[in-house]
Regions:
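Small-molecule-sensing regulatory modules
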Residues: 1-136
Length: 136
């Protein structure tokens, strides 16, 4: 995006599609943290006005996947959640450390069924060996 804004084109530039390179969990989302002590009046109201609830929910779910697999920001885990009309489309890809073996899973569920559907999805990832794969 920055290269486009600056009008810079490079012959060796390739924009990856999500099918080629799924992003890490919460990649590209901006998080703002505030200190409870000494907070200026109105800060929470301002932040609530710029918070996108769908992005907030999707990134929380992406991070839940990483946590379920006992991963970290250094783990080879990609997760992308997209919420449209209260329906989540979740794509997850995990690999071993050198990327030679991968597991890819996706699911679609209503946000009304989030808790049970997400638990079933996380359990399925674990059952197919995703935890072990990221450690190998």
């Amino acid at each position: 995006a920055a290269l486009n804004r600056l009008g810079i084109q490079h012959p060796n530039l390739h924009v990856f599609s999500e099918s080629e390179m799924l992003p890490a969990a919460s990649q590209g989302a901006i998080g703002i943290e505030v200190c409870n002590t000494n907070m200026q009046p109105g800060i929470l109201e301002i932040l609530s006005n710029i918070n996108c609830q769908e992005t907030f929910k999707a990134t929380r779910i992406e991070r839940e996947i990483v946590a379920a697999l006992e991963g970290s920001c250094l783990s080879p885990i990609s997760a992308l959640g997209t919420i449209t009309n209260q329906t989540l489309y979740l794509q997850v890809r995990v690999s071993n450390q050198d990327g030679s073996n991968t597991i890819e899973k996706e699911c679609v569920f209503s946000m009304a069924d989030e808790e049970s559907a997400l638990k079933k999805f996380k359990d399925g990832l674990i059952k197919c060996g995703a935890k072990e794969l990221i450690q190998s």
